[in-house]
Amino acid sequence: MSVVSLLGVKIQNNPAPFLAPYQFEITFECLEQLQKDLEWKLTYVGSATSSEYDQELDSLFVGPIPVGVNKFIFEAEAPDLKRIPTSEILGVTVILLTCSYDGREFVRVGYYVNNEYDSEDLSAEPPAKPIIERIRRNILAEKPRVTRFAIKWDSEESAPAEYPPDQPEADILEDDSAAYGAEEAELEAALVRELADAERDVKSEDHEMEGAEPAIKEEEEEDISDAESEDIEDESDDDEEDLDEEEAGDGDEDVEMGDDSEQKDDGPKADSTNQHSHQPEVMVH
């Protein structure tokens, strides 16, 4: 756990002329009393290709540090143009704001800085020799890159572990990279097998469909012939039934005409039986 935590950084003059000093309002919190001072430092990266052109703009010792939230203004001079390659003056570069305790850096804040002319004409056609008075810097304050480091403070208990703990079982395990590659190879081989099986299934289904078409046609023809034969048989049966009904109909008429008196006698009996059958329903109500 860090004893000092950086809470915020505000850039006072931004954008500003290239030769104007840098001004930062820094807010930090101290959790316990410190025996030594904090060292703040601002570094200008003169070239992206080599650290040879990096230059320390200024450094400041702050202390003694009271416990709680603290705030101060850190001001640093502009970089020395003689130490910057002419081709690197314009364009994008980086400044680094760092803080150390007892020579041990525990926080670093990096900002992108864009150096460009204040005129569109000069930006479109920059002169061979840069006009420093017309160059303005713009710090991208909204997108800082903050890096924190674990360090030893005043007590030995606060010191971070210099070496990772012993893990003898880790030496027995296989290399993760080799296992990862083997898993990828297995997955790829399994995928190839699945695709091949799927293609074979599709081809076999196509052959089955081609062989099944004649059989289906034969079954349809058999069904049609069976249906026609059934229709013919049904028609012949219907004709025979019609003839039987006509003959039976004549006999029925003769019987009804001859037994008319018997049907009249049976009528009241049927009504009386119906009345008797309805009486239980009335009694229920």
UniProtKB/Swiss-Prot annotation:
Residues 218-263 have a biased composition (Acidic residues). This is Histone chaperone asf1. GO terms for biological process: cellular response to stress; DNA replication-dependent chromatin assembly; nucleosome assembly; nucleosome disassembly; positive regulation of transcription elongation by RNA polymerase II; protein modification process; silent mating-type cassette heterochromatin formation; subtelomeric heterochromatin formation. One of its GO terms (molecular function) is histone binding. Keywords: Chaperone, Chromatin regulator, Coiled coil, Nucleus, Transcription, Transcription regulation. Belongs to the ASF1 family. Residues 196-285 are annotated as: Disordered. Its main location: nucleus.
